[in-house]
Amino acid sequence: IISGLVGSEMCIRDRGNRFNPIHLMLATGTDSIAGRFDDFGLQYADDMISLPLQCATQWDALGHIFYDNKMWNGYSAALVDSDGAQKNGIEKVRAEMAGRGVLLDVARWAGVDYFEDGIAITNDDLNECAKSQNVEIKRGDFVIVRTGQMEQRLDDGEWGGYAGGDAPGLAFETAQWIYDNEIAAICTDTWGCEVRPNETKDAQQPWHWVVIPMIGITTVSYTHLTLPTKVR
C-alpha cells in the first residue's frame, strides 16, 4: 500500500533488488502532433510509474520479516512466494485496521527541529513525550513518532542515505514498550523506524526481528508529518 510518494531518490539497490521509481510516458502530445492517434479518434497523454513498494510511504505487513524462516503466527516463510503473501499480507487487514492515532512529536519535545542520525529514542523518551502532551497511550492505538528527519531532508533537498542509511529511530528496548502498551501499529518519518546504526553489530535490524514476526505489529515508514505537526 502506498500512501504518498515523497521523493524519487529514496530507494536504493539492495539484496532485495529494489530500484528507484521509473516514470514512463506511454502517450504524449508529440505523438498526437505526429498523427499517431488519427485512426483512433482521440488525442491524449498517458503515463505509468513502476516502483518497489518500499520506495514510498508504506505499511510493513506481518509477512515482511521472518525469524528462523517463520513469520507471525508461526507460518512458514515459504508462504511468501512469487505469487505474493499467502499469509499475513497487508491486504488481509485493509478493512480491519482502524483506531486512534497518537502523534508523539519527540523532536519537538526534545527541543530540536530534527534528531541527528544515530540518535536512539528510548522508552523514557516516549513516556515523557506522551506525558508532556497530556496523552495516554491505550490498547489498540496507532502511535506515530516524529523525529523530524523527513522535514529536514525535504528542506535540504539532500536525500543521500535517507533510504537504507543511518537515521534516528526507535531504540531496541522500545519493542518492550510496544508490547506492554498493546498498540496496534507504530509509524515514523524515517525509512525503517529503528535507529541506525543499530545498537548491536550482532544482528541486522534486530528491532524488526522482534516487533513484526514475534509481537505481531505492523509498522509504517516514510510518514510525512509536516501537516499533522502544524495542526496538533
PLM features: residue spans?
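Single conserved hydrophobic/aromatic residue that forms the stacking wall/gate
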Residues: 1-7, 12, 224, 229-231
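Feature captures the catalytic cores and cofactor-binding loops of soluble hydro-lyases/lyases
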Residues: 145, 149-225
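Short conserved micro-motifs on helix faces and helix-strand junctions that flank
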Residues: 4, 55-57, 143, 186, ...
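Structural motif
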Residues: 9, 48, 100-103, 141-142, ...
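A long-range scaffold signal marking pre-active-site subdomains of enzyme folds
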Residues: 8-9, 13-54, 67
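Alpha-helical hydrophobic/aromatic positions enriched in membrane-embedded helices and signal peptides
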Residues: 1, 50-52, 97, 181
